[in-house]
């Protein structure tokens, strides 16, 4: 709650933001109790597009459930598929060819860039700027073309398989990716000149929407939200998986905790993703992309397994309980956006509604991932 504003609970009114509203970026309702233009309290309401993804994971075989993972966070589908196949591979002791691991890293980071570009354009549009959205979507189109060339899809890829990949990459993909990296670095400079150093953007974001490290820990916030509050945690560095321990990259961390800090974390992350992609292509080995011998029907040993990856919005976890059958006895999906969203109710108290929408944009919510 702001120290400068004394709100009167006897002079409030209720304002519904959503569930159909462009600022919520999905079917999300926020029930606001307002005192003028200031927020007295807020309650996020979800459940409008709940699809029972966890229950489907218990009723379908492990292979049949793979397409579901691309339909949670549809902007970061590669990372979610990656987390699931890692959990099954870990539980089933399935070996993955080295070439497949490097290609996974390339495609995940390309998808992370694509996701951040959507966030960047939509976030600036929330603040009243339209042109950056066009710039961002133009760059994102290059990524979608690259991923479509190897997966056949532009959004819900379902590219990974247990033990490897659906399809190999070719020289044309590698050449196109290197051209994109050159283009993207020029674009990042344009974004800095056009947006990041813009005084209007700074006034809208700096010292606004402050999230303390304690609040992050209280709600389990991860990803750019936590790193914008000084919490130096990234699964790729702290708990390396796949071949991320082979790459040299930095984790952007800002300690201010305001909306501008979260903006800067994501902008800096785009350069780090480019570094990872470059190194992965330089070190890309030959060989197969999937083992010659692997079971057609996967049955995992009885046990309780957990796997986590760093998705575009934070730590995505899979808890998989097996009873030895062809499908999971219990499947739990740990959504980063679900945790990040719930701190909004506490942080926005005392804020102007316009600043609260900037705060919501800095959280980078994807509603289908919350409403699983």
UniProtKB/Swiss-Prot annotation:
Keywords: Cell inner membrane, Cell membrane, Membrane, NAD, Quinone, Translocase, Transport, Ubiquinone
Enzyme category, top tier: translocase
GO CC terms: plasma membrane
The keyword Membrane is annotated on this UniProt entry: yes
UniProt GO molecular function: NAD binding; NADH:ubiquinone reductase (non-electrogenic) activity; quinone binding
Compartments where found: Cell inner membrane
Membrane-protein topology: Peripheral membrane protein
InterPro entries assigned: NADH_Q_OxRdtase_suD (IPR001135), NDH1_su_D/H (IPR022885), NiFe-Hase_large (IPR029014)
Translocase found in the keyword field: yes
Assigned EC number: 7.1.1.-
Residues annotated as transmembrane: none
Highest taxon listed in the record's lineage: Bacteria
Catalytic activity: a quinone + NADH + 5 H(+)(in) = a quinol + NAD(+) + 4 H(+)(out)
Oligomer status and interactors: NDH-1 is composed of 14 different subunits. Subunits NuoB, C, D, E, F, and G constitute the peripheral sector of the complex.
Function: NDH-1 shuttles electrons from NADH, via FMN and iron-sulfur (Fe-S) centers, to quinones in the respiratory chain. The immediate electron acceptor for the enzyme in this species is believed to be ubiquinone. Couples the redox reaction to proton translocation (for every two electrons transferred, four hydrogen ions are translocated across the cytoplasmic membrane), and thus conserves the redox energy in a proton gradient.
Homology family: Belongs to the complex I 49 kDa subunit family.
Protein name: NADH-quinone oxidoreductase subunit D
Source organism of the structure: Desulfotalea psychrophila (strain LSv54 / DSM 12343)
Gene name for this UniProt entry: nuoD
């Amino acid at each position: 709650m702001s120290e400068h504003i004394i709100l009167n609970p006897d002079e409030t009114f209720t304002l519904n933001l959503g569930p159909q509203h462009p600022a919520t970026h999905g079917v999300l309702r926020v029930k606001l109790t307002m005192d003028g233009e200031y927020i007295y309290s807020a309650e996020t309401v979800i459940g409008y597009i709940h699809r029972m993804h966890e229950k489907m994971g218990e009723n379908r075989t492990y292979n049949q459930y793979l397409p579901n993972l691309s339909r949670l966070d549809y902007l970061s589908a590669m990372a979610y598929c990656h987390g699931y196949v890692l959990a099954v591979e870990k539980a089933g002791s399935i070996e993955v060819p080295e070439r497949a691991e490097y290609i996974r890293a390339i495609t995940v980071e390309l998808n992370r860039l694509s996701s951040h570009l959507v966030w960047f354009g939509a976030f600036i549009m929330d603040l009243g700027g339209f042109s950056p959205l066009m710039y961002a979507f133009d760059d994102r189109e290059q990524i979608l073309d690259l991923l479509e060339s190897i997966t056949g899809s532009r959004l819900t890829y379902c590219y990974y398989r247990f033990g490897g990949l659906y399809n190999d990459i070719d020289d044309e993909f590698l050449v196109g990716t290197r051209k994109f990296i050159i283009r993207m670095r020029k674009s990042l400079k344009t974004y800095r000149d056009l947006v990041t150093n813009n005084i209007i953007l700074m006034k809208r974001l700096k010292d606004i929407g402050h999230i303390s490290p304690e609040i992050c820990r209280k709600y389990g916030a991860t990803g750019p939200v936590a790193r914008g509050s000084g919490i130096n945690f990234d699964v790729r560095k702290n708990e390396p998986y796949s071949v991320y321990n082979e790459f040299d990259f930095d984790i952007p961390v800002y300690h201010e905790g305001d909306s501008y800090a979260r903006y800067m974390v994501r902008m800096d992350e785009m350069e780090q993703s480019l570094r990872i992609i470059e190194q992965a292509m330089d070190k890309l080995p030959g060989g197969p992309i999937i083992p010659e011998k692997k079971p057609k029907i996967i049955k995992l040993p009885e046990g309780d397994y957990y796997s986590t990856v760093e998705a575009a919005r934070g730590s995505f976890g899979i808890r998989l309980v097996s009873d030895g059958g062809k499908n999971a006895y219990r499947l739990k999906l740990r959504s980063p956006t679900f945790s990040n969203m719930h701190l909004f109710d506490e942080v926005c108290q005392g804020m102007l509604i316009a600043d609260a929408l900037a705060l919501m944009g800095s959280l980078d919510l994807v509603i289908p991932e919350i409403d699983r």
